[in-house]
Amino acid sequence: MAETGSVHATRFEAAVKVIQSLPKNGSFQPTNEMMLKFYSFYKQATQGPCNIPRPGFWDPIGRYKWDAWSALGDMSKEEAMIAYVEEMKKILESMPMTDKVEELLQVIGPFYEIVEDKKNRGSGLTSDLSNVMNSTPNIKAVNGKAESSDSGAESEEEGLREEEEKELQQNVKDCKSPKTESLAAKDLENSVANDCYKDSFIPDMQNGIQTKSALNGLNVEEEIKKTEPSLEIANNCDHRGANEENTEEVSGTQHLTSDSDSEVYCDSMEQLGLEEPLEIITSAKGSLKRSSHFLDVDHRLQLENTDLPRHACTTAGNLQLGTAVDGAVQEKGEVKCGGEDGKASNGAPHKEKKDGEKADFYGVRRGRGHRLHPVGDGSQGGQMGNGGDGERWGSDRGPRGSLNEQIAVVLMRLQEDMQNVLQRLHMLEAVTASQARSATLQSNYQPASSVKKPSWWPFEISPGVLAFAIVWPFIAQWLVHVYLQRKRRKLN
């Protein structure tokens, strides 16, 4: 018992030192109720029960202290010490760490053991798990459960993958069905009628999808209607495949179908880079419809001038539309009628050149946010004409240069607007300051002027001056009279 009492006394003394060392203006300020508790427990632990009389009404603080102390009744000193330390434990975490607090923590020890014991007694499941972990066979069983759960998760993932593969296969079958082909043909006819093309039309043209009919003697619109359903089918299949990144890229730019959309208000460089090929393709389709007879003439010139076999020429004619669109997408590269590259490899077959273009555009398609690189080495933009008449189609302006110019123009206009706003602001400030000064001056001088000269006074001089001028002669006469009377009295 003596050892227990000494432990409680030591803890109590350490807690009292902590309370006494608290600064008056420190970060931790205990409440009045808390200080009353500490006071009552301290008095009970040091002096015992309260035996002094209650203070008078003139000492309200003493009365509160006496009430708190006397409320403890016959509590023993040891119990008061324990209660004092327990109250200290409640606020110990919120107190700043000082030397006294460290000393108290060393004396008290790990006072969270009660929570740990209660947790261990209340949770039988935790003890069971600890027993399982301590025994070797149970560890194997647990590992087996873990492995089975992992294998179950893997089987679920495999099932999801199989479902995705089945969906992809079903999408491919749907793409091959004639119903989908008819729907794609209708969508593509509508897009051709509106001169609007999706951005995914460009890489699909480069993936080797070729038409099987020559352009000799056929109308361009009929050829487009015949060739583009297969392109739209491949486009839909490609978008339903694993290339989700390109799907998001195309869906984000499908609304850019008008030339009136300004590049200044685009959200990103990627959107700007995708807007240029759309404008080029739109203008290219219009020129293709307007100059169908140029296609026939140039195709006959190609058959006469080339040294390739006839089936190679036919293949070149079939590739005419795809190569023309290739040239429209290119920033640099000269394309003439008939799908013939103006400055490509000398006498090389069109099939080899087509493969090279496919590789380049495939790389462009895989990269997001990059500009389309030229395939040909021509110094001018895309051209289309009859033998060299230089009929322009597409856009010759550099997208990056035009973007920089537009940004510069916008910045200049913004600076001008800001200067105008600043000038107007300075003018308003000056007018406000002048009005304030005039109002102050009027308020200062108005009372004086009202005293000197009222608004109803018809004369220029003030009423006071006029009254003084009238009264002054009488006053002067009276003073002279008084002076003369005194002088007479002195003489007498």
UniProtKB/Swiss-Prot annotation:
CDD domains to which the protein is assigned, alphabetical: ACBP (cd00435)
GO biological process, one term: fatty acid metabolic process
Compositional bias per record (Basic and acidic residues), positions renumbered to this chain: 335-360, 389-399
Keywords of this entry: Autophagy, Coiled coil, Lipid-binding, Membrane, Peroxisome, Transmembrane, Transmembrane helix, Transport
Major localization listed first in the record, in broad terms: membrane
Topology of this chain in the membrane: Single-pass membrane protein
Stretches with biased composition (Gly residues): 378-388
Cross-referenced PANTHER family: ACYL-COA-BINDING DOMAIN-CONTAINING PROTEIN 5, ACYL-COA-BINDING PROTEIN, ACBP
Role noted for this protein: Acyl-CoA binding protein which acts as the peroxisome receptor for pexophagy but is dispensable for aggrephagy and nonselective autophagy. Binds medium- and long-chain acyl-CoA esters.
Entry protein name: Acyl-CoA-binding domain-containing protein 5
Species in which this protein is naturally found: Gallus gallus
